[in-house]
């Protein structure tokens, strides 16, 4: 039981931690103290539902559909490419502008819409929750499967609320930091986590020989949320 829960928690964190569109949005809401708890809560709820679906049968259904798998994989490639280009353009045009100079405050409806957008329109979320966490957890017996799903969900709760509250605590420092240096710092911080998650996926492929994992690693070895 302990080994299963440890695997569920660490694998859950490994899937979530690398900074991508979803995490970056949670971070930005925390920095600006703009409905950050609402953003974190909505991200957690989406993860809880998707992890549950994946662990209790959704992963097997998706793995049996080559077309669906291909759409998710290439959708993830395109989404990651778009997000990377958008971030680079934003950093280039900012040219040292301070975060405090553009508060980017949003209303509740806008925050809800953006959070759902960067979550449910992000193919990496489905790859992480439905495919990878789901396929790993579905191999356990029923009682262990429930424990795995629970601690994977707990990892999501811990991460998103830590990210939101951490951004609030660090917001005075981050607000004084220039955009270029802030983004470089974020990149340096998340690079080890990115590699950690790639190793987890390679381990899943080697140990459990899931037919879809080698395909994902070959096409795009570092998905970011």
Curated annotation (Swiss-Prot):
Presence of the UniProt keyword Coiled coil in the record: no
One Pfam family linked to the record: LysE
Keyword terms of this UniProt record: Amino-acid transport, Cell membrane, Membrane, Transmembrane, Transmembrane helix, Transport
GO function term, MF aspect, one: amino acid transmembrane transporter activity
Keyword Cell membrane part of the UniProt annotation: yes
Subcellular compartments: Cell membrane
Source domain of life: Bacteria
Topology of the protein relative to the lipid bilayer: Multi-pass membrane protein
Record's protein name: Putative amino-acid transporter YggA
TM region(s), chain numbering: 1-21, 37-57, 65-85, 116-136, 150-170
GO cellular component: plasma membrane
Family: Belongs to the LysE/ArgO transporter (TC 2.A.75) family.
């Amino acid at each position: 039981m302990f080994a299963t829960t440890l695997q569920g928690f660490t694998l859950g964190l490994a899937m979530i931690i690398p900074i991508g569109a979803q995490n970056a949005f949670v971070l930005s809401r925390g920095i600006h103290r703009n409905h950050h708890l609402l953003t974190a809560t909505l991200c957690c709820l989406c993860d809880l539902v998707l992890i549950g679906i994946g662990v209790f049968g959704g992963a097997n259904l998706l793995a049996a559909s080559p077309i669906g798998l291909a759409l998710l994989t290439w959708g993830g490639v395109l989404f990651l490419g778009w997000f990377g280009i958008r971030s680079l353009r934003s950093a280039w045009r900012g040219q040292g502008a301070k975060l405090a100079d553009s508060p980017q405050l949003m209303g509740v409806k806008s925050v809800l819409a953006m959070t759902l957008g960067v979550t449910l329109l992000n193919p990496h979320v489905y790859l992480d929750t439905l495919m990878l966490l789901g396929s790993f957890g579905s191999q356990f017996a029923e009682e262990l499967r429930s424990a795995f799903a629970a601690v994977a969900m707990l990892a999501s709760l811990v991460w998103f609320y830590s990210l939101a509250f951490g951004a609030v605590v660090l917001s005075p420092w981050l607000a004084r930091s220039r955009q270029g240096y802030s983004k470089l710092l974020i990149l340096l911080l998340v690079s080890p986590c990115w590699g950690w998650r790639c190793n987890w996926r390679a381990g899943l492929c080697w140990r459990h020989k899931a037919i879809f994992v080698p395909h994902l690693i070959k096409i795009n070895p570092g998905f970011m949320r």
